[in-house]
Amino acid sequence: MEESINPIISIGPVIFNLTMLAMTLLIVGVIFVFIYWASRNMTLKPKGKQNVLEYVYDFVIGFTEPNIGSRYMKDYSLFFLCLFLFMVIANNLGLMTKIQTIDGTNWWSSPTANLQYDLTLSFLVILLTHIESVRRRGFKKSIKSFMSPVFVIPMNILEEFTNFLSLALRIFGNIFAGEVMTSLLLLLSHQAIYWYPVAFGANLAWTAFSVFISCIQAYVFTLLTSVYLGNKINIEEE
């Protein structure tokens, strides 16, 4: 399997991955269009497209509210809805098609199949939990809960690091492996004409399985984000 590269552009010391940037903008656009379309002309008794939006919304609230608590859920409900939709689409984009030039430049892939992208998402989640902890409880109380008692400071630092790393590596491993297997099956179909039916059937089954795994990973990522955030903002006052 030939190595693929993503096109990049440099602005001073900052390097932008054009494929990841384009995929991210596409995902944001799809989410915006979906929510705008489904929320137009909403009625008290939901029907049609409104049912779809409310079903997804209720599903996300159902597994995140126990971690956040009803007290804060209304402030974060739209965030978790958009995060879940973002991860579902991001995980499955690379399964739809593959756009790659002869020289190996890749113009279409799942952004979450890129380790740097996943590490960035994970870092933003951990950063958000600390920002919200300070905003909800104040800087002093947040620091105190993190550094008291003193002997648990190394354990707390290790916990934050492992949370950050596991959140990124879990989703990267699953999505990257899915795209690699899809590429291998496509290559198999090009080897000989008699391999085509086998490769087609295997690729169809693998794609269906990968979509399922991708949705599960979106669920897990959103769930863990709610757990980490809930742990930071729901600490009982001393």
Curated annotation (Swiss-Prot):
Instruction: List the Gene3D superfamilies.
Output: ATP synthase, F0 complex, subunit A (1.20.120.220)
Which compartments does it reside in?
Cell membrane
| Major place of residence | membrane
Domain of life of the native organism: Bacteria
Which membrane topology term applies here? Multi-pass membrane protein
Can you name one GO molecular function term for this protein?
proton-transporting ATP synthase activity, rotational mechanism
Q: Which family does it belong to?
A: Belongs to the ATPase A chain family.
Protein name, per record: ATP synthase subunit a
Give the organism, scientific name.
Streptococcus pneumoniae (strain 70585)
